[in-house]
Amino acid sequence: MAKRWRKRAGRLAALVIAAGIYTFCIPAAAAEEATGGMANAVTLDIPARSCILVSGDTVLYEENADEPMPPASITKIMTLLLTFEALEAGQISLDQTVSCSDYAASMGGTQIWLEPGEEMALSDIIKATAVNSANDCAMVLAETVAGSEEAFVQKMNERAAELGMENTHFENPTGLDADGHVSTARDIAIMSVELLKHDGVTDYTTIWMDSLRNGETGLTNTNKLVRYYDGCTGLKTGTTDGAGSCLSASATRDGLDLVAVSMGSDTSAERFAACRTLLDYGFATYESFTPAVPPEQLTPVPVSGGRAESVAPAAAEAGPVIIPKGRGEAVELAVTLPEGLTAPVAAGEEIGEAVFTLDGETVCTLPLTAAEEVGEMDFAFALGRLWELFTRPPAFG
């Protein structure tokens, strides 16, 4: 997955440069600065050791995005991801009551001070993890989903491998500093995008202030962008001595979904400034474009030797793609269909393609498929058609 991100990033950077959005030249050194040969369209002043900006699996900007370093509580993105996957699989439920173990109650760092044996609704445990970054609650989630911290950490690393997080290894579900517990900005972006695919996640990650225990325990989101950045949908902060100040911030405007990750900032204020700069750049530079083929360009294709004279092409539905802002009307479409087909034609069989380009660069290719089956004409069918022709009442005008 990481390699696919780099490939798409290179194509998109070329589009941005070709679009002439910026009037200055890109130095050769800057063009080769990012991992995998990606050319950032600009060089931003990001107060972090490592950062990345993505939309889906498209990289829009990156600096040192593959350096492994401690991720602190951004780790909890994976903890939440496995929790929501277990919820959707029906293995656990939001309204179930869970109990805090002695071990979970012993976690250091940020917590809501769960007592051993204290019971709470799973939804509240998720809330405290997502909003307050509570380590005791993160451990309760791990034990609820997998039975033990060890089993949960194994699931974390297995899921990371499945997602293509090539430079990540987890040692715990909390993000507390531990030998070998590392990730990268790119890998954090990957799991952030995956988490945001799940319904209900942003119901928690967008909470600014709330409370638990009948109002006795106040919660304030550690991610200040939730309150102060327009369109912010989350996601997770992290701070330890080893990691410094980290943040994975997500935001949506005008259909464009962005995730910005910064790692290793010196202060909390710097991590917010880093992600704000990345998000501002993304929203100012790119837009979401949904490719669609006009019906008038989907002309029926003649079919020889078939039970129908032609078959209508159908275009697959496309998700949004990222293009330079303000260039949507410049996207060109080329539809390729055959002059004819020979029966049989299967429903869903690929018979052509629609290619969307911008300034000569392909931004999306959609397969065109047969909308319905066209069976091969046989003697019995042909005889039946002849009979219909001879027995049809004459038309009088």
Q: For each predicted feature, which ranges?
A:
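Active-site-adjacent loops and short helices of periplasmic peptidoglycan-processing enzymes
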Residues: 28-186, 190-199
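Structural motif marking the loop-to-transmembrane transition
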Residues: 5-9, 71, 122, 379, ...
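Domain-terminus/edge residues, biased toward the C-terminal soluble/receptor-binding domains
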Residues: 165-169, 177-397
